[in-house]
Amino acid sequence: MSFVKMTGSGNDFVFFDGRTTPIDLVTQPEAIKAICNRYNGIGADGLVVLEPLQEEADVRVHYYNSDGTAADLCGNATLCSTAISAQWGITSASGMRLATGAGLINSRIDGLPAIALQPITDIRPDMPIAPATAQGRRVGFAVAGIPHLVILCEDADAVDVAGAGPALRRHEATGPAGANVNWVSPRPDGSWRYRTFERGVEGETLACGTGAVATAVLLRSWGLSDGATTTIRTSSGRDVEVDLEPLTAPDGRSLEGFRPTLRGEGRVVFRGEIAGL
């Protein structure tokens, strides 16, 4: 079976073309774990199958975490899906509609892939979690397709992500499914540095697209970012950009929430064949 290995700012994925790969074959939990294994498999944070559609969208994005569980959305995987869908000729680079578990996403390639996520309205600037316990100064929550804790701290690079992440990822305040956990701190140039502990990977990843979106939303809610675009440095050293458009009613009234657009890398690393599962 043919595959493509892709990366979005260090968040890496194994992609399959649903036109030539039986979806059921590669999306069994044990198959996903084997393919994503970094020692005996290809190695990745997640697995994606792209299935061309005819009506409600151009492509359905089937996304799975490396532990074999399905997820409604992965921002960096969606950026990569945008790039490879155009390369495979499934869609046009100038605009495409991607069906995800978190709703329809419009995307395009304009230098870098850019995806317009569904509006974010579940925003909680203060969570009932002691900031000191979370190694930060303030703890907020937002659902950017999937749930995220965002923790404002002095220096994200000094945080013990591996030590603090597991308990926070399952904190009762985030609900039964838990949440990804993001730590964010300011950089001298006005951008931000963040690190993420991801559920489903159960460890730190080099980048998290929806985490960057949730982080930008909380920074705006906390009054720490007032520009249209928030630039966030990932652990791979690459930047992602998040644009936030305040929601408005048809009559012009302001509504609670934002309409986000995420821009970032979606790059093919290598192509190959799987000998067997």
Swiss-Prot record:
Pfam families tied to this protein: DAP_epimerase
Location in the cell: Cytoplasm
Pathway: Amino-acid biosynthesis; L-lysine biosynthesis via DAP pathway; DL-2,6-diaminopimelate from LL-2,6-diaminopimelate: step 1/1
GO molecular function, one term: diaminopimelate epimerase activity
Site positions (Could be important to modulate the pK values of the two catalytic cysteine residues): H148, E198
GO BP term, example: lysine biosynthetic process via diaminopimelate
Catalytic reactions of this protein: (2S,6S)-2,6-diaminopimelate = meso-2,6-diaminopimelate
Main location class: cytoplasm
InterPro entries the record matches: DAP_epimerase_DapF
Enzyme Commission code(s) on record: 5.1.1.7
Keyword Isomerase: yes
Active site: C74 (proton donor), C208 (proton acceptor)
Gene Ontology cellular component terms for the protein in this record: cytosol
Binding annotation for substrate: N11, N65, G75, N76, N180, E198, R199, G209, T210
Keyword terms of this UniProt record: Amino-acid biosynthesis, Cytoplasm, Isomerase, Lysine biosynthesis
Family of the protein in this entry: Belongs to the diaminopimelate epimerase family.
Role played: Catalyzes the stereoinversion of LL-2,6-diaminopimelate (L,L-DAP) to meso-diaminopimelate (meso-DAP), a precursor of L-lysine and an essential component of the bacterial peptidoglycan.
Subunit structure: Homodimer.
UniProt-recorded name of the protein: Diaminopimelate epimerase
